[in-house]
Amino acid sequence: ICPVPAQVLAAEYLDEIASCSSFMGTSGCETSCTAPCTHKPDIIVAGHSKGGNLAVYAASFCSSAAQKRIVHVYNFDGPGFDAKVLSRPEYQRICERTTTFVPQSSVVGMLLGHEEPYIVINSEQSGLMQHDLYSWCIERTGFECLEKVTDGSRFVDATLKSWIAGMDYSQREGLVDAA
């Protein structure tokens, strides 16, 4: 079930962006993607929900030249990957530069597998409504963090993982296509 077309396109897009000589008028660089440039700025990749999954996938499977410039990947409540992706060296190389944020009752962000650390954020909503980033609580210096996800989140996560593990490949593919 991996890669899906969106993941392939995300990795290609990241390579295209990384090959550009300039990012929003970087000092000392031309504005054309074909112009020579002595300064290649660092890259930060981020996304929410499916976009978080795409950000992690793209950062993992883009070119090695692009990957070397990635300083961090932020996944905001995006699903993880199956064991095949998690074991790939491309994913492992980017994993230590990846942080996933999930609300305390996360469902989406706990789907499939994650090896990167995750930070639990307090949300003013309940249940699935916590997936909305605008419900996440912030303080002066950043997110209002909690120690762990709720027991309900862990229960739903274990139940979904067990259910998905019992599916054959075509059923999993149908589930991914439906999302």
Please identify what each model-predicted range represents.
Residues 55-64:
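Short glycine-enriched nucleophile-adjacent loop
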Residues 1-21, 37-42, 63-179:
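Alpha/beta hydrolase fold serine-hydrolase catalytic domain that processes acyl esters and thioesters
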Residues 47-51, 55:
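Gly/Ala-rich beta-loop-alpha elbow adjacent to hydrolase catalytic centers
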Residues 26, 31-38:
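Ala/Thr-enriched low-complexity intrinsically disordered regions
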